């Protein structure tokens, strides 16, 4: 690790870095590369992710003497409840729509189904997110992005299914 000094302008909202928002050892850090600006993925805001900020900082590492690393992004799950009837719908993870179905009166089985759906090869390739069964109804399904990208979850329920809070409770996922 290299010692240095710098400044960061931080706001309460999650926004991408602009040129001049950060300075390290007297060197202005530019905005993240354009590859992080995806107009089709407004939900997860990849340009504001830790991954994008690290790329911007590391682009100037020869000038600053500093390299940045990103930590795994972890999104905790939600407490689960069981339902006498199965629920179905979709979870949109980082802009990618994944079909989900839960089981009747079986939180453990529902967690396993959610984990399998999110970890399916096509879903993982599209989202970069891994689902982990916490093994605990109180903790639900944990999501991780090892490369530090943002994790954004949105529910789309089938007609007649429960509201978002009830759907979250039977899937073990947290919307946000």
Q: What residues fall within each predicted segment?
A:
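Small-polar (Ser/Thr/Gly)-enriched, low-hydrophobicity segments
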Residues: 1-12
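Extended, beta-strand-rich, solvent-exposed assembly scaffolds of outer structural proteins
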Residues: 13-176
């Amino acid at each position: 690790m290299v010692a240095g000094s710098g400044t960061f302008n931080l706001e309460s909202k999650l926004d991408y870095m602009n040129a001049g928002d950060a300075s390290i050892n007297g060197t202005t850090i530019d905005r993240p590369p354009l590859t992080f600006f995806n107009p089709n993925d407004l939900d997860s805001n990849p340009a504001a992710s830790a991954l994008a900020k690290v790329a911007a900082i590391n682009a100037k590492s020869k000038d600053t003497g500093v390299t940045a690393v990103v930590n795994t992004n972890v999104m905790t799950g939600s407490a689960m409840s069981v339902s006498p009837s199965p629920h179905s719908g979709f979870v949109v993870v980082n802009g990618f729509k994944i079909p989900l179905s839960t089981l009747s009166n079986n939180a453990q089985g529902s967690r396993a189904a959610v984990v399998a759906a999110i970890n399916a090869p096509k879903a993982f390739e599209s989202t970069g997110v891994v689902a982990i069964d916490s093994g605990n109804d109180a903790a639900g399904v944990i999501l991780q992005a090892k490369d530090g990208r943002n994790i954004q979850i949105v529910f789309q329920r089938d007609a007649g299914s429960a509201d978002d809070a009830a759907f979250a409770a039977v899937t073990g996922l947290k919307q946000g």
